[in-house]
Amino acid sequence: MIDMLLKKLIKSLPKKKNIRVQGLSINSKKIKKGYIFFAIKGKNFDGEKYIDEAVKKGAIAIVCSKKCQYKHELIPIIKTNNPRYFLSKVCSKFFRFKPKNIIAVTGTNGKTSVADLFYQILSLNNKPVASIGTLGIKYKKNNLKTNLTSPDTINLHQALENIKKNKIENVIIEASSHGLHQRRIDHLNIKAGIFTNFSQDHLDYHKSMQSYLKAKLHLFKNILLKNKAVISDKSLKEFITLKKISKQKRLRLIEINKIEKKLKKNNKIKSLNKFQLKNLSMAILAAKICNVNEKNIFRILHKIKGVSGRLELVRVFPNNIKVFVDFAHTPDALLKTIIALKAQNKNKISIVFGCGGDRDKKKRPLMAKIVKEHCEKIYVTDDNPRNEKPGKIRQEILSNLKKDNSHNIENRANAIRTAIKNASPNEVILIAGKGHETEQ
């Protein structure tokens, strides 16, 4: 068990408070004797309502907002303007050991692909590597599933320390907009930040595109330190902003153009679709920053595998009906995926898709418009409805489609079976939205 003097973690405490810290938690139910409880206000829960429970379970200090009214004669109450920021600062001291080369990748789409490709490149070059993101926390033979793209602050720092203890110095983290906004990635010594792209998503949380972009740019504006690297695509509209930030903060801006051109001339990459070349370019540049030689990278490219659930060909039937699976759950990703399929398949494309509940509702008509324009048969089904009524979500999509080629099928498995049953020889079926996920 890691323990540390409280005054070493939190300098603002009176010097007489020589209390041993055994752990940190944002969940009152997980508090044990000797833990600090961070009473954080979230979307669904207010941590300040659970301070009493944390104290009864043995919390030795409470961190909360300046507005918090809680008082205790024996336990220090540390009030701060931003408890989330304060948590990441304390975590960086409590979990002291971190890998030398930490790469963070953000953007609307492509984070998981970049992370997976980076992991493959380093593994194939016999460099110990880890990845943290949508596919879980992966290193050596460990693959721990997580519910979040970016784990909560404590779990993230703890995971990084475990990775370091396993003698791994290279790690890539998927930095989601939620994770960045909630300061989960603050106070990490990140060697390079990758910006993949930017399009509409998560407006249920961020409320506007400006706020959403601001969250993404937090990585470059506030987390990356002087002389660290920024990797991005020159053709993006946001590249100009990244250039300004890089100049102001004296960051090294690296664009993918040269590497991407080399990849287009390379005939050895068989398992990746053309639209993955940008993601591969970013992964290669990140690998180079981790001291992997470019020649050695290009030597192993023929061994690179497609990313699980990213335009993955999962089945070919005897009559040449092809079934692809993709994680596309934003208008931009869906359009790019369909266009990529059209480029390599001259045949009709049918789609099975839905939209997630309790998420950006403005995406639904936009995604309907895309499939209406590009797909022959459309099977609208459920996709993680969460707390919304599934039928209502499907109806919002269907109201933007033609009746003669769209089908409303509640059960996802039935929708897939129906699409395959109704398919003509040589037809392409795209199952979009869930990618690698196996549960609803």
PLM-predicted stretches and their roles:
Residues 1-89, 93, 237, 241, ...:
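N-terminal leader/targeting and accessory segments in enzymes
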Residues 51-56, 164, 186, 342:
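Non-catalytic positions within long, well-ordered alpha-helices that form the structural scaffold/packing
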Residues 35, 54, 90, 105, ...:
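Residue-level signal for inorganic ion chemistry
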Residues 60-66, 194, 229-234, 352-354, ...:
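Short internal beta-strands
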Residues 6-7, 64-73, 164-175, 179-182, ...:
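Acidic, Mg2+-coordinating active-site environments of NTP-dependent enzymes
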Residues 1-18, 30-36, 42, 49, ...:
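ATP-dependent carboxylate-amine ligase
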Residues 133-155, 159:
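P-loop NTPase switch/communication element
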Residues 91-136, 142:
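Walker A (P-loop) phosphate-binding motif
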